[in-house]
Amino acid sequence: MRAIGHFLPHLRGVKQGPEHPATLLDTLLSHQSDSARLKSAHAVRDHFTTADDEGKRAFLQLLASGYNTDGKLLDAAISHYRKQRDPLSLSMLHAASEPRRQTILRRLNELPGGTASIIDMRREALRLKQDIPDFAALDHCFVHLLASWFNPGFLELRQLDFQSSADLASKLIQYEAVHAIDSWQSLRSRLEPADRRCYAFFHPRLGDEPLIFLELALTLDIPDSIEDILRSDREVIDACDATTAVFYSISNCQQGLRGIPFGGLLIKRVVDLLRAECRSLKTFVTLSPIPGLARWLGETGGGAFQPMTDGQDNALIASASRQTLLSRAAQYLAATTPDHGDPVARFHLGNGASIERLNWMADLSVQGLRQSYGLMVNYRYDLDHIDYDHRAFAEGALPRMSSEVRLLAGLSRQQSGKRQQNG
């Protein structure tokens, strides 16, 4: 890691010109007219966006380490609060404890396109974080502000179809992170039929740039293969005849918003829409990958399962290990906690879902075989249990699971609600 001084040419004794980032940031923080402040914000943004990686690192480290809380102001606020101990002095103390970098970010947000610029700045910070010694302090400010600016009240839910703009459609192809869309015909098959839907969240400051999108299928039963969802020669059903909504792909679109939670809210909002539209819907499930399974097996003595990457032949060979692999997968998912385990499992279980079923050879793509030996899982959103299961999982209970999954994991009914101390 580079020495701190490498990033801080603004240290005492180094001459600062008008285009030096410290000069630009100090000017932005100073008392100015509205027009002068916007001009300063433009200068800061232009400096960052045109800088190379070395310049971006230096700027971000300067922002992280050089614009903390004003110590004198904080000491005065603490002293005042100790004397008064009233709501006003507490509010003043809170304001005084805020790092000056948050004021800088707020002023950058005042620019046209300012919110997008801050998202881009955080994306770059995440990319370069290994070379930003004080990244954690900086990212705390990014997350604090972005979580407020992107709270549910500001989010717009839209249904996307094949008549959506070509620009928006191309973004769906670009951002799809679970099951690649390899052609316009493939996109059409996901958006146009009566039993296929796609929904996305948008923010008024980002226009037609999606934050996250969710693809789903309306079916007559719970599917056990992604091929059943994606194949083009399937029989299309009327949406009002469907009994099951299957969420099979959810993709975050903005790297700079990583860690800002949208997915759980999107699923719940879509469930409400679907229930109002299709009274026949009774079951809400996912068909989800298990991206951490192969790695976990390799780390926990599962080396007997050889990596599979070339499709059906390996899938057939692996069938001899079917029961063992299903059991190990069930154990892996059952051990999920809010902070540990498969990332997709943490997401759905943290939103109140349960583990419904493991599906053998459900994804025979190269990625599906490599990361989970072709296994996929159905998580179930039982509307009568979501809130309870969300709280229980957050408080340390084992995930709720069907009797089939519980049996595969080797758990008794008595064990299913309680996490072992060593697990």
Regions found by a protein language model. Name each.
Residues M1-I260, G264-G423:
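Extended, composition-driven regions rather than compact fold-specific motifs
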